[in-house]
Swiss-Prot record:
HAMAP family: PSII_PsbT
Source organism of the structure: Chara vulgaris (Common stonewort)
Name of protein: Photosystem II reaction center protein T
Principal location listed in the UniProt entry: plastid
Cited PANTHER family: PHOTOSYSTEM II REACTION CENTER PROTEIN T (PTHR36411:SF2), PTHR36411
Length: 35
């Protein structure tokens, strides 16, 4: 059970950092699809 909690926290932190970078400078690959 503890492993699940630690994994969830790790994924959550990585997700937040990923989102921060995403919004700071949007990737051009996705910009192509999302025009």
């Amino acid at each position: 059970m503890e492993a699940l909690v630690y994994t969830f926290l790790l994924v959550g932190t990585l997700g937040i950092i990923f989102f921060a970078i995403f919004f700071r400078e949007p990737p051009r690959i996705i910009a192509k699809t999302k025009k």
